[in-house]
Amino acid sequence: MLQSNEYFSGKVKSIGFTSSSTGRASVGVMAEGEYTFGTAEPEEMTVISGALNVLLPGETEWKVYTAGQVFNVPGHSEFHLQVAEPTSYLCRYLK
């Protein structure tokens, strides 16, 4: 079953799904902007196209991730994103 989600007044949209190859996941697109997301469980984020400037929990420096790169976010935390161009991503929930 597919589940559509919309955040930040429609600037971030995703479709949640479960498959045998990825487990529970969502794929989405972010418009230009700055966003803060909270996590309930650990997440693995893969940039599909574009780029994300990311500030992970406990870090003091932002890091840019581009197409094909992956970063992990701990559960029960917040992370910050700066998006300079429309960017697509895959988020896998690792619980």
UniProtKB/Swiss-Prot annotation:
SUPFAM superfamilies: RmlC-like cupins (SSF51182). GO terms for molecular function: guanosine phosphorylase activity; purine-nucleoside phosphorylase activity; thymidine phosphorylase activity; uridine phosphorylase activity. Its EC number is 2.4.2.1, 2.4.2.2. Pfam families: Ppnp (PF06865). InterPro entries: Ppnp, RmlC-like_jellyroll, RmlC_Cupin_sf. GO terms for cellular component: cytosol. Keywords: Glycosyltransferase, Transferase. It catalyses: a purine D-ribonucleoside + phosphate = a purine nucleobase + alpha-D-ribose 1-phosphate; adenosine + phosphate = alpha-D-ribose 1-phosphate + adenine; cytidine + phosphate = cytosine + alpha-D-ribose 1-phosphate; guanosine + phosphate = alpha-D-ribose 1-phosphate + guanine. It comes from the Bacteria. NCBIfam families: PRK10579.1. Belongs to the nucleoside phosphorylase PpnP family. Catalyzes the phosphorolysis of diverse nucleosides, yielding D-ribose 1-phosphate and the respective free bases. Can use uridine, adenosine, guanosine, cytidine, thymidine, inosine and xanthosine as substrates. Also catalyzes the reverse reactions. This is Pyrimidine/purine nucleoside phosphorylase. It comes from Enterobacter sp. (strain 638). The gene is ppnP.
